[in-house]
């Protein structure tokens, strides 16, 4: 019975999903994040501006507004 529990634990460990592995990599999302920006649904926070789109146009790419 202990072998069965150990086998079950090993199988769960081997077949667990890695975080983010199911997310498709959209080219616009990769371009946004490589520039140090982030993706957000809806409007960007107050000190950020929309600099493009992410996830095939479903989200906004938010960039920090440069200090003056």
UniProtKB/Swiss-Prot annotation:
GO molecular function terms noted in the UniProt entry: CCR6 chemokine receptor binding
Induction: Expression in the theca and granulosa layers of the F3 stage ovarian follicle is not affected by intravenous injection of LPS.
Signal peptide (residue range): 1-19
Disulphides: 32-61, 39-54, 44-62
Record's subcellular location: Secreted; Cytoplasmic granule
GO BP terms: defense response to fungus; defense response to Gram-negative bacterium; defense response to Gram-positive bacterium; innate immune response in mucosa
Keyword vocabulary terms for this entry: Antibiotic, Antimicrobial, Defensin, Disulfide bond, Secreted, Signal
UniProt key word Disulfide bond: yes
GO cellular component: extracellular space
Keyword match Glycoprotein: no
Annotated propeptide span(s): 20-25
Expression tissues: Strong expression in the testis, liver, gall bladder and kidney. Also expressed in the ovary and male and female reproductive tracts. Expressed in the ovarian stroma and the theca and granulosa layers of the ovarian follicle.
Family designation: Belongs to the beta-defensin family.
Function: Has bactericidal activity.
Stated name of the protein: Gallinacin-10
Lineage, highest ranks first: Eukaryota, Metazoa, Chordata, Craniata, Vertebrata
